[in-house]
Amino acid sequence: MPTWVRAAPDISPDPTNINMNLSSPQIDAMAERLDDAMRQRRPLEPLTSTHPGIDIDDAYQISLRWLHRREAAGERVIGKKIGVTSKAVQDMLDVHQPDFGFLTDRMELADGASASLSALGLIQPRAEGEIAFMLNKDLQGPGVTHQDVLDATAWVAPCFEIVDSRIRDWQIRIQDTVADNASCGVFVVGTQRTDPAALDLAGVTMRMQRNGQPAGSGRGDAVQGHPAEAVAWLANTLGARGIPFRAGEIILSGSLAPLVPAQAGDRFTMEIDGLGGCSISFVD
């Protein structure tokens, strides 16, 4: 397991920046339904179908209530993630703006892990090849630039994020995926640590294989032109809600290529130029 020291991230929003359409009991009920869907591995109908008035602030509050349930069950927040950052993923999901969520220690697996779909509550997982950022300085938006991100980064590493929607058949709109903690499932960070100043992250290429066969590839500039731009976007988006980045957090910057469905028996490997690689396998 990883050995770096993690901060205790701030996750409580500034209440003056919240404008919700749904009532607090409705938000609690949706968080409970998402939690039950994960634990029972039974996907829900889209929240935007059952509650058409839901907006981004509602969705974000649902994700926080769900996160608080997970913390109450013993999970610990260790970072944040950005999703739907590349055009390829936006086109695939028909969601045309990034989303955001939180990472807990239960979501993190060791490089080369054999992941049990049932034990982890994964329903309809898909693999993403990403670049992970480990922060060694605090960042507070708004006004964070991609250079600020690079200056605050201790190292970058290759990362598999295994996204998973608790929404049936991935029929999501932006409110659905934000409420669903940005469709986060589990993640694996490679063991090679690289100074982000040592190479051009926009120009690197990621190559993914599933069961020894090519499964996808993409460049760093597929993620908002530069992975650090995506991290800056998240710092500013959460900063507007009163939530900073803290030193010791790990940030997943978004997929470099289209998502690849995963099932029991699959083994995924991935390499990124200059950053090394990582792998993950799946069992029932």
Kindly give the residue locations of the regions a language model identified:
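A short pocket-lining beta-strand/turn micro-motif at the edge of beta-sheets
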Residues: 241, 246-249, 266-268, 276-278
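A conserved acidic, glycine/proline-rich C-terminal tail/linker
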Residues: 231-260
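Intrinsic-disorder-associated, low-complexity terminal segments enriched in Asp/Asn/His/Tyr and depleted
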Residues: 10, 14-19
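Catalytic-core "active-site belt" of small-molecule-metabolizing enzymes
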Residues: 21-226, 263, 267, 275-284
